[in-house]
């Protein structure tokens, strides 16, 4: 895998608050190598390590995108939901930004059935098929469609398991991470000071609570994916 330059600036990361970890009482000792200091009861993340692992992650996603691989971005915190959707759409990635449904990947056959149902209902709605039904039946189907849109809207074009999964909060998305580990799907995960750095294939130490921090990391990864996609198109 070729190493590239991704313009990861330490001062820019500081302005985004990437270096702020959790309180010193709420930490995972395995994160010690990624912590540079304690300040006012808060662990400070070593941004040099962040830059190194973020650069590695960018190299990985660029390489995968340049070979036409598929990505899934998972971030279900309310405050990050819109950010996740916009970033994923920009890079033509699948995404889950509302709720991870248990077994979404490990029980893929069930997820596929839900996606088929979702597509059928969307087609029915577009062709005004609901208007030909009794009001009560139409209302039931509209509720089903709304629910499916909420939980599966970001993966509606997914036809198989993703090649790489990007996880924006290890603790919040632990079920998703475990499913990826079970299936052997490579993962990139943001890890705050209360996380386990040994679970994902590439763990990026960073503040996973502040929107500015999540945006900074996600924008770098999405840029690398977009660059890789451009390379794939040029070489096709």
UniProtKB/Swiss-Prot annotation:
Question: Does this entry carry the keyword Ribonucleoprotein?
Answer: yes
In its UniProt entry, the species of origin is given as: Capsella bursa-pastoris (Shepherd's purse)
| A single GO molecular function term of this UniProt record | structural constituent of ribosome
UniProt protein name: Small ribosomal subunit protein uS2c
The UniProt keyword set, sorted, is: Chloroplast, Plastid, Ribonucleoprotein, Ribosomal protein
One GO cellular component term:
chloroplast
**Which Pfam families does this one have?**
Ribosomal_S2 (PF00318)
Q: Which CDD domains match?
A: RPS2
Q: Which PROSITE patterns does the protein's record reference? A: RIBOSOMAL_S2_1, RIBOSOMAL_S2_2
């Amino acid at each position: 895998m070729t190493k590239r330059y991704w313009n990861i600036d330490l001062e820019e990361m500081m302005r985004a608050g990437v270096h702020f970890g959790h309180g010193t009482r709420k930490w995972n000792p395995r994160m010690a190598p990624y912590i540079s200091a304690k300040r006012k009861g808060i662990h400070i993340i070593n941004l040099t390590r962040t830059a190194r692992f973020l650069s590695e992650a960018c190299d990985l996603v660029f390489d995968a995108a340049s070979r036409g691989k598929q990505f899934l971005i998972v971030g279900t915190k309310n405050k990050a939901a819109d950010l996740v959707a916009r970033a994923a759409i920009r890079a033509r990635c699948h995404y889950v930004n509302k709720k991870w449904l248990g077994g979404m990947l490990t029980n893929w056959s069930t997820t596929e059935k839900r996606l088929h149902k979702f597509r059928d209902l969307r087609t029915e709605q577009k062709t005004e098929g609901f208007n030909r039904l009794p009001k009560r039946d139409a209302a039931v189907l509209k509720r089903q469609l709304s629910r499916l849109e909420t939980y599966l809207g970001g993966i509606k074009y997914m036809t198989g398991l993703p090649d790489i999964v990007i996880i924006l909060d290890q603790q919040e998305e632990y079920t998703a991470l475990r499913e990826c580990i079970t299936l052997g799907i490579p993962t990139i995960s943001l890890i705050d000071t209360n996380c386990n750095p040994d679970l994902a294939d590439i763990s990026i130490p960073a503040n996973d609570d502040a929107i500015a921090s999540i945006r900074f990391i996600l924008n770098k990864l999405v840029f690398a994916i977009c660059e890789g996609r451009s390379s794939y198109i040029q070489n096709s």
